[in-house]
Design a protein with these regions (language model features):
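Enzymes that bind and transform nitrogen-containing heteroaromatic metabolites
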Residues: 1-204
Length: 204
């Protein structure tokens, strides 16, 4: 059985996007700095099945390839789905996506695409994603879904692409936890160009 884990770019002060994010500016004001590491290196990495080409460090290229290979499904909230316009019917990682929502969007035009709209809660979405992922991991995002997973005891690992910048405001990854201290075990550190890839096991 795979793990339930995050996979997000985060500023040093804990934000995953800048202030005033919305459909026209999904990363908010200044939030594009969180993605600068995708072009900060000298090793070319092409995301399979897309025309997305990154220039990263060799270590980051290996990390990105590994992340794609070990991900079997993903869970997102409706807000992230709306901000990204549903990724045009295909997530860049080309994995099944489960969207936690109170209602199925009526204007969804990508019938047959690997998107499942789950209206009976987060735990149901995670269980469905795990069933599809099999031995691979389930990636969860963004902030609200991560926080809910932590509070529900569903999150196994935190994978964090720590970007060397202070945003000063925006959407906080670990806001609204209200669960007291949560112990983590650091299990991996990968230094890249403009980013440090960190993995923590959530102690349960």
């Amino acid at each position: 059985m795979g793990k339930v884990r995050t996979g997000l770019s985060v500023s040093l002060d804990g934000f995953i996007s800048g202030p005033n994010d919305g459909p026209e500016a999904p990363m908010g004001v200044g939030g594009e700095r969180l993605l600068a590491w995708y072009s900060a290196g000298d090793t070319e990495y092409t995301l399979p099945g897309t025309d997305m080409v990154f220039r990263v460090s060799p270590q980051t290229a290996e990390y990105l390839a590994e992340t794609r290979a070990t991900t079997g499904a993903m869970v997102f909230g409706r807000r992230t789905f709306d901000l990204t316009h549903g990724w045009g019917g295909k997530h860049p990682l080309d994995k099944p996506v489960f969207v936690v929502t109170s209602s199925v969007p009526q204007d969804w035009v990508y019938e047959g695409s690997p998107f499942t709209f789950v209206t009976d809660g987060l735990e149901s979405a995670v269980e469905q994603a795990k069933a599809v992922a099999g031995d691979k991991d389930v990636g969860v995002g963004a902030a609200s879904i991560v926080q809910q997973c932590i509070k529900a005891g569903l999150l196994d690992e935190i994978h964090m692409d720590l970007v060397h910048v202070l945003l000063g405001g925006g959407v906080s990854l670990f806001d609204h936890l209200e669960t007291g201290p949560i112990d983590l075990e650091r299990t991996r550190v990968i230094e890249g160009a403009g980013v440090t890839h960190l993995t923590f096991r959530v102690m349960k």
